[in-house]
Amino acid sequence: MGSLNVSIVTPDGPVYEGVAQMVIARTKAGELGILPGHVPLVAPLKIDIVRLKVESGEEWVAVNGGFMEVNGEEVNILADTAEREQDIDIDRAEKAKQRAEEELSRAKEQKVDEVMAQLALQRAINRIHAKEHN
């Protein structure tokens, strides 16, 4: 089986550069599995985990929105933010989740920006999920 050159980049710089046999990502249209030779595409990403099937097993990256471009044997992900599972501070992620839940509760009571609170909660849960998947 061939391989894919994968790049995950945020405005702050590269998060992942490497080779994978498969990339699995959740787009706005649903989950996609990308193998070498996949048709070219550009797809908006949801807040979710990008799973990279590599020789040593699987790597998870918490991606918070952005776009995925597939072109030949290359997969480029331009993410709003992204963190590899080994870089996630679980205590910080748990605190962010708690703050987001509290903000969401206040938002419902005070009719303030509920959408922003829901997004913050999704991002925190996504980071926790990436860190605790094993």
UniProtKB/Swiss-Prot annotation:
InterPro entries: ATP_F1_dsu/esu_C_sf, ATP_synth_F1_dsu/esu, ATP_synth_F1_dsu/esu_N, ATP_synth_F1_esu_C, ATPsynth_dsu/esu_N. GO terms for molecular function: ATP binding; proton-transporting ATP synthase activity, rotational mechanism. Keywords: ATP synthesis, Cell membrane, CF(1), Hydrogen ion transport, Ion transport, Membrane, Transport. It is a peripheral membrane protein. GO terms for biological process: proton motive force-driven ATP synthesis. One of its GO terms (cellular component) is proton-transporting ATP synthase complex. Its main location: membrane. Coiled coil: none annotated. It is found in: Cell membrane. F-type ATPases have 2 components, CF(1) - the catalytic core - and CF(0) - the membrane proton channel. CF(1) has five subunits: alpha(3), beta(3), gamma(1), delta(1), epsilon(1). CF(0) has three main subunits: a, b and c. Belongs to the ATPase epsilon chain family. PANTHER family: ATP SYNTHASE DELTA/EPSILON CHAIN, ATP SYNTHASE EPSILON CHAIN, CHLOROPLASTIC. Produces ATP from ADP in the presence of a proton gradient across the membrane. This is ATP synthase epsilon chain. It comes from Listeria monocytogenes serovar 1/2a (strain ATCC BAA-679 / EGD-e). The lineage of its organism: Bacteria, Bacillati, Bacillota, Bacilli, Bacillales.
